[in-house]
Amino acid sequence: NPNGSPLDPHQQQQQQQSQDMPHFGLPGPQPPSSQQQQQQMQVHHQQQQQQQQQQQHQQQMQMSLLPGPYRPHIEEKKLTRDAMEKYMRERNDMVIVILHAK
């Protein structure tokens, strides 16, 4: 059959395409969703970091502002958290940096 040999590579190509298409189609929708999750996690992590930094900063300020008897660590932490929440409420110019993972 003279048509047999030219048809073979063409059929192979079609088979490759049908195998490749699901392979190419799957990663398309997936990365954006995992990217968004990454982004949200990063934002959440950064907000936590910011709060921790503020807590540390305020702890240092309290330590220098409050001479006198040494306060128990737990009480001090509670005070700092209250101060931090008050600070977060009063400050409206908070800047949150969002990193976009590529």
Curated annotation (Swiss-Prot):
A GO molecular-function annotation: RNA polymerase II cis-regulatory region sequence-specific DNA binding
GO CC annotations, alphabetized: CSL-Notch-Mastermind transcription factor complex; cytoplasm; nucleus; polytene chromosome; RNA polymerase II transcription repressor complex
Record's subcellular location: Nucleus; Cytoplasm
Top-rank taxon: Eukaryota
GO biological process: crystal cell differentiation; imaginal disc-derived leg morphogenesis; imaginal disc-derived wing vein morphogenesis; long-term memory; negative regulation of Notch signaling pathway; Notch signaling pathway; positive regulation of G1/S transition of mitotic cell cycle; sensory organ precursor cell fate determination
Signal peptide: none
Keyword Repressor appears in the UniProt entry: yes
Amino acid composition bias (Low complexity), ranges on this chain: 33-64
Region (Disordered): 1-72
Swiss-Prot/TrEMBL keywords: Activator, Cytoplasm, Developmental protein, DNA-binding, Notch signaling pathway, Nucleus, Repressor, Transcription, Transcription regulation
Described purpose of this protein according to its UniProt entry: Transcriptional regulator that plays a central role in Notch signaling, a signaling pathway involved in cell-cell communication that regulates a broad spectrum of cell-fate determinations. Binds directly the 5'-GTGRGAR-3' DNA consensus sequence, which is present in the regulatory region of several genes. Required for neurogenesis in imaginal disks. Acts as a transcriptional repressor when it is not associated with Notch proteins. When associated with some Notch protein, it acts as a transcriptional activator that activates transcription of Notch target genes.
Family designation: Belongs to the Su(H) family.
Subunit structure, as described in the record: Interacts with activated Notch. Interacts with Hairless, this interaction preventing its DNA-binding activity. Interacts with insv (via BEN domain).
Protein name: Protein suppressor of hairless
